[in-house]
C-alpha cells in the first residue's frame, strides 16, 4: 500500500510544482525572451489548457491500457517539456513548453486519483485525499522559496532543470515502484454493482459531486487569482506582507487537511462537507461586511479552512461508484474543475466584476448550491464502497 501512496503523491505534485516553481523567475524570463510579464502571465492559462487537453484522453487510456503506462508517459512529457522551456529563446517556444508541461502534469494527475480509487475503500480514500490536499498546499509555499534559492546562484533556466529532474524522479517511481492497479475483471458478485448505469458519468450522484468539487475549486482558484489585487492594491500590503500572508493561509490549509482524517473518525463525511460549505458561506458574508483588514483576513482564512475540510471527502464520494472507469471519472472531474473555474474567472473579468465581489459571489453561490445538493442527493448504498481489485501485472 505504501508504494501506491508514494507514487500517487509524487504524481499529483507535478501539477502545483509546474505552476508555482517558475513564478519567482518571471521578471528575468520576460527580460531574456523580450516579452512583458503580462504576456508571460498567459503561461498559467496555457498550462491549464494543456492539463485539460491531457485529461480528455488520459482517463480513457488509463482505463483501457493501465495506469502505469500513462504515468510513465506523463512524467516523460513533463520532463521533456521542462527542458524545452529551459531552451526557449522567445515567448512562443516558452508557451509551447508550458502547454506540454500541462499535458504531462494532467496525465499524471488523472492517474493518481484513479490509483487511489483502485486501492482504497471509501473511508480510507477520503482520509488519504485530505492528506494529499494538505501536501499539495505545501508546494505553493515551498516552491517559490526553492526557486528563489536556486536563482540566487543560477539562471532562471535552472528552475526548469529542477522541474525536469522532478519529472525524471516521478518517471522512475512509476517505472520501478508503481504496480498496475487497473482492475482486470470483477468477481461475478460485483458485476451488478458496476453496471453501466452505476458507472455512468451522468449518474445523478456523480454529477452532484462533480458540481460540488468544481464549485469548490472555483472558490480556491478565485482566491488565488484575486489575492494579489485584494492584498496589495485594496489592502495596501507590500510584496513581503503578501508572501507572508499567503504562507500563513497555506499553513491553515495544511493544518486543516492533516486534521481532517482524524475528524472522519468522529463525524460522517456529509457532516464535514456541510461544515466546508458553511465555512464558505460564512467567509462570503464576512468579506461582504468587512471594513477592516483584520476582518478581511479572517474571511480569507475561512476560505482555506473550508476548502481543506471538504474537498477530499467530496472527491472520494465522486470516485466511489467507479471501479472499471475510475480513469474516465477522474478525467471528467479534472476537466470540469479546470474549465469551470477558468470560465468563472474569465466571465467575471469580462463583466468587470471587482476582485472582492468576484470572490464573494463564488463563495455564496458555491455554498448555497452545494448545500442543496448535499441534502438532496445522497450516496447510493447499492454501490459497493470498494471492490477487491485483482491486479493485471505486478511489475
Curated annotation (Swiss-Prot):
Pfam families noted in UniProt: MFS_1
Primary subcellular site in the record, as a coarse category: membrane
Keywords for this protein: Cell inner membrane, Cell membrane, Membrane, Transmembrane, Transmembrane helix, Transport
Protein location: Cell inner membrane
Signal peptide span: none
A Gene Ontology term for the protein's cellular component: plasma membrane
Topological category with respect to the lipid bilayer: Multi-pass membrane protein
Ranges annotated as spanning the membrane: 4-24, 42-62, 69-89, 93-113, 131-151, 158-178, 217-237, 247-267, 271-291, 295-315, 328-350, 355-377
GO molecular function: transmembrane transporter activity
Domain of life of the organism encoding this protein: Bacteria
Similarity annotation: Belongs to the major facilitator superfamily. DHA1 family. MdtL (TC 2.A.1.2.22) subfamily.
HAMAP family according to UniProt: MFS_MdtL
Protein name: Multidrug resistance protein MdtL
Annotated organism of origin: Salmonella schwarzengrund (strain CVM19633)
Species lineage: Bacteria, Pseudomonadati, Pseudomonadota, Gammaproteobacteria, Enterobacterales
Gene: mdtL
